[in-house]
């Protein structure tokens, strides 16, 4: 394929984004409660009811008034032959004769016609579920034309032939209805079984920009693609579909949930210990070291001992006692003569005391400066070690990136472990560390952090419900407490979904769209309503009005047809 032709063909499906959209429908990413509305939407029950209504209306309209009146005269003659001693002109005889004929006519239709229609409806001859998936995901529907299912058609025809044999000795109305049923059902089966909507994994779709046409490929053959909602094609393809509009929120919720699970795993990993030496232990180690390596008369030991004891005492009286004890030990005098005899100290003693105090202050200041210098050096060492490790990590990542193709990171669609590669390779959960001297643990990471993904799930549920309700105009059915029981199609839903499937996909132009009053009714209730408003019911009621003048109020015909 030359470059000019390649530029004129744009791949639409499968692409990374289109496959993600179908996987979302299958519940792979962030399946929430609101997405269950899609299951209600793809239920083929509404189209099955529409097919049932079309077939039943068609067969009931096939009979003529002459057929009905002929059957009535035949039935009336048989009744008179069996009941020769009855008064044929009495109202009771006429009424019972007419009602028995009308009711047996209805029961025969239910037995021979409805049962065969039910078998056709439940034979899974449509691809309505996959059609709904394509509309939800891409707004494009590939349609495969194939040969009709002759095996299924012959099976249904054999059942209808058996029903026709049962009605062979009956009236002209039943023979006409069964003949019309066989013709209508055969036509429906040939149309519906010659259409197949493939799964998203079975087909490819391309857009020919030159012809402005979508073309599908199924098993190496070109197929037609019906455009329900046309996508926007620019630099990238943006599908005009509900799942495309929800995609960013769905993936964000999914990644947050995945991130929360990683946080649980990382924050609860086995940790040996974070050890730090206490202050008291440091002082005791210093004193023990001095006692082992120095004599008791060593002035360094005495000064350090004084500093340690002063640091351990927090009260004024305690500090005073420590100072007095130190002066007593240094002067080796147990009794303070000045306090005992009240004599004033001499000038020499005062000078010695002043010099001693200054020496103590100088030594204390020098020791504190040494400790501060040591702490600063240790902090600088840790800082530079951290920077070196960071630089090494960055160099390692750059080296790895050079070996791979460069592509911009996308947190929404990239793998979570790759997005959290730095956190994944962290050694915090695999090594033990010591707290440096003079440092404090600001965050121990022992408390578990989990992102608020539950709130995102609730928001996504509401977003799913809002999108589907407003896009397809569904209506909820609630109980007296206001709890939603289920959702059902409205007339707008029928127009938006059933209409394109009926006229664009299956090409059933002779079929009327279902009225929304039938979408949640049972088949028996629908059959009763259609029969009561059919041409056959009108003919039967007309015969009753003429044969039984007392029934002109319509009560008899309504009771019969509504039974």
Curated annotation (Swiss-Prot):
Keywords: Host nucleus, Viral genome packaging, Viral release from host cell, Virion. Its main location: virion. GO terms for cellular component: host cell nucleus; virion component. It is found in: Virion; Host nucleus. InterPro entries: Herpes_Portal. One of its GO terms (biological process) is chromosome organization. It comes from the Viruses. Forms a portal in the viral capsid through which viral DNA is translocated during DNA packaging. Assembles as a dodecamer at a single fivefold axe of the T=16 icosahedric capsid. Binds to the molecular motor that translocates the viral DNA, termed terminase. Homododecamerizes. Interacts with terminase subunits TRM1 and TRM3. Belongs to the herpesviridae portal protein family. This is Portal protein. It comes from Saimiriine herpesvirus 2 (strain 11) (SaHV-2). The gene is 43.
């Amino acid at each position: 394929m030359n470059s000019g032709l390649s530029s004129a063909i744009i791949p639409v499906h499968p692409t990374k984004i289109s496959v993600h959209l179908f996987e979302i429908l299958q519940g792979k990413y962030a399946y929430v409660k609101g997405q269950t509305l899609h299951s209600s939407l793809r239920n083929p029950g509404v189209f099955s009811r529409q097919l049932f209504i079309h077939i039943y209306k068609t067969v009931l309209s096939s009979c003529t008034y002459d057929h009905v009146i002929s059957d009535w005269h035949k039935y009336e003659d048989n009744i008179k032959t069996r009941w020769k001693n009855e008064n044929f002109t009495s109202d009771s005889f006429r009424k019972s004769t007419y009602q028995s004929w009308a009711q047996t006519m209805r029961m025969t239709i239910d037995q021979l016609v409805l049962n065969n229609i039910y078998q056709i409806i439940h034979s899974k001859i449509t691809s309505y579920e996959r059609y709904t998936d394509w509309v939800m995901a891409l707004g494009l529907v590939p349609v495969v034309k194939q040969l009709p299912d002759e095996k299924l058609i012959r099976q249904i025809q054999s059942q209808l032939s058996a029903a026709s044999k049962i009605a062979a000795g009956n009236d002209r109305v039943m023979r006409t209805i069964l003949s019309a049923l066989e013709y209508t059902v055969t036509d429906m089966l040939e149309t519906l079984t010659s259409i197949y909507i493939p799964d998203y994994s079975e087909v490819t779709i391309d857009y020919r920009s030159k012809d402005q046409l979508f073309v599908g490929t199924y098993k190496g053959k070109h197929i037609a693609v019906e455009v329900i909602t046309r996508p926007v094609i620019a630099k990238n393809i943006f599908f005009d579909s509900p799942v495309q509009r929800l995609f960013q929120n769905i993936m964000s919720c999914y990644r947050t949930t995945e991130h929360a699970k990683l946080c649980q795993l990382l924050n609860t990993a086995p940790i040996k210990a974070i050890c730090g030496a206490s202050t008291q232990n440091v002082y005791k180690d210093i004193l023990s070291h001095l006692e082992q390596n120095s004599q008791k008369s060593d002035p360094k030991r005495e000064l350090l001992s004084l500093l340690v004891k002063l640091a351990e005492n927090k009260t004024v009286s305690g500090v005073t006692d420590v100072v007095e004890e130190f002066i007593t030990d240094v002067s080796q005098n147990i009794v303070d003569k000045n306090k005992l005899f009240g004599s004033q100290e001499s000038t020499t003693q005062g000078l010695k005391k002043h010099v001693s105090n200054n020496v103590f202050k100088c030594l204390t200041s020098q020791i504190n400066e040494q400790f501060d210098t040591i702490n600063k050096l240790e902090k600088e060492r840790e800082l530079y070690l951290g920077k070196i490790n960071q630089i090494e990590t960055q160099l390692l990542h750059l080296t790895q990136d050079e070996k791979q193709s460069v592509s911009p990171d996308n947190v929404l669609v990239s793998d979570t472990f790759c997005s959290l590669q730095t956190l994944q390779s962290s050694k915090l959960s695999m090594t033990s560390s010591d707290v440096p001297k003079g440092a404090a643990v600001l965050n121990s990471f022992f408390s578990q952090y989990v992102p608020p993904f539950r709130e995102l799930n609730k928001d996504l549920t509401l977003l799913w419900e809002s999108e589907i309700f407003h896009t397809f105009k569904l209506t909820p059915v609630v109980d007296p407490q206001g709890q939603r029981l289920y959702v059902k199609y409205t007339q707008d839903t029928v127009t938006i979904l059933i209409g394109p499937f009926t006229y664009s996909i299956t090409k059933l132009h002779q079929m009327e769209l279902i009225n929304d009053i039938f979408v949640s009714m049972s088949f028996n209730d629908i059959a009763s309503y259609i029969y009561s408003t059919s041409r056959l019911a009108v003919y039967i009621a007309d015969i009753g009005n003429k044969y039984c003048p007392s029934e002109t109020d319509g009560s008899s015909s309504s009771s019969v047809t509504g039974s």
